């Protein structure tokens, strides 16, 4: 992950690490409706425990703002596009609210579907 992303004001500059942003995402995604868990990229069928959620999240930056990729497992029987849209919206809102940084894109990769419970 990148070393940091900056927010500047008249009082100075604040650097926010990609790991800190990934932690925000890691706390936000499991609370979204339809998410069973998160999975490491390319690892179908293996849910990650809370302490390893950063393996399911990639944070990058560009001139337009942050780009966040995340890998999820969605509950079977739900509309995947609707669940992904909810995740995108919620992640962008929480990251912008908590960091002051602009989120340019949130890419949701559905790694698997499974019954909840």
Which residues are covered by each model-predicted region?
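Conserved amphipathic alpha-helical interaction elements at protein-protein interfaces in regulatory
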Residues: 93, 97-98
């Amino acid at each position: 992950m990148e070393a940091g992303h900056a927010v500047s004001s008249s009082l100075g500059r604040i650097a926010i690490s990609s790991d800190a942003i990934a932690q925000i995402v890691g706390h936000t995604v499991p609370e979204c409706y339809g998410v069973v868990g998160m999975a490491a990229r390319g690892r179908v069928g293996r849910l990650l425990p809370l302490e390893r959620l950063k393996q399911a999240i990639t944070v990058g930056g560009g001139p337009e703002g942050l780009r966040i990729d995340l890998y999820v497992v969605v509950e079977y029987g739900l509309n995947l596009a609707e669940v992904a849209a909810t995740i995108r919206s919620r992640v962008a809102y929480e990251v912008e609210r908590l960091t002051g940084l602009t989120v340019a894109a949130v890419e949701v990769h559905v790694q698997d579907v499974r019954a909840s419970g």
